[in-house]
């Protein structure tokens, strides 16, 4: 059985300390690999299923790559919350968001544990996450996120897929990609899959990730 950095039996302080230590490396990696441009293209081709005033959560925002991509591409004003366990990562994300030009969107930052999120049931119309569920047991992570989504709401997950590139990233960032069959079964148990997007192989994000949009029934 995989040993995850963050589980229900490990303290937030211990897990948060790990993320704080890797924040700069994590941020540098995303700066040079073109993930932001790939996300812009994805959101241009697949607009987020939101309406004016929708409540959106970036669960595990890290240094803000996905949050910033949403700010660049959202066409309507939403209530956006960005949450992460690492204070250092969130500080970096806040800095980048503050420099975002011509954005009418407001972002609320919160520190929290993805396995025990500080929100009531059905608090969000859309939750997005990337590179987070690989740090936690799949059932626990999915269950907690599904709890927060309204019936008819959406969940956008950018999971890691098993590749040589993913294996290198596993060693670098101490996560564990979930087996595709287990990921598919767990996704279908909580959501109806609307789309499963494969990033182009010539984009670095395509070496390790896909994008799965699910709807909570």
What is the meaning of each model-derived region?
Residues 57, 63-115:
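Class I SAM-dependent methyltransferase SAM/SAH-binding core
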Residues 128:
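A conserved beta-strand element that flanks and buttresses the S-adenosyl-L-methionine
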Residues 131-132:
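Short catalytic micro-motifs in class I SAM-dependent methyltransferases
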Residues 152-160:
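Conserved beta-strand signature within the Rossmann-like core of class I S-adenosyl-L-methionine
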């Amino acid at each position: 059985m995989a040993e995850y950095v963050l589980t229900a039996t490990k303290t937030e302080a211990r897990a948060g300390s790990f993320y704080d230590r890797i924040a700069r490396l994590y941020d540098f990696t995303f700066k040079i690999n073109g993930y932001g441009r790939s996300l812009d293209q994805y959101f241009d081709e697949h607009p987020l299923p939101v309406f004016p005033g929708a409540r959106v959560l970036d669960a595990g925002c890290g240094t803000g790559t996905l949050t910033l991509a949403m700010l660049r591409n959202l066409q309507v004003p939403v209530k956006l919350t960005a949450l992460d366990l690492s204070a250092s990562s969130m500080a970096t994300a806040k800095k980048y968001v503050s420099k975002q030009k011509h954005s009418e969107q407001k972002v609320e930052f919160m520190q929290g544990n993805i396995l025990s999120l500080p929100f009531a049931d059905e608090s969000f119309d859309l939750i997005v996450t990337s590179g987070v569920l690989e740090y936690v047991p799949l059932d626990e992570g999915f269950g907690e996120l599904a709890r927060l989504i309204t019936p008819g709401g959406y969940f956008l997950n950018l999971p890691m897929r098993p590749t040589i590139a993913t294996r290198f990233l596993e060693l670098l960032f101490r996560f564990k990609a979930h087996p595709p069959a287990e990921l598919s079964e767990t996704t279908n148990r909580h959501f109806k899959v609307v789309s499963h997007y494969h990033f182009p192989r010539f984009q670095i994000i395509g070496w390790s990730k896909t994008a799965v949009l699910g709807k909570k029934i």
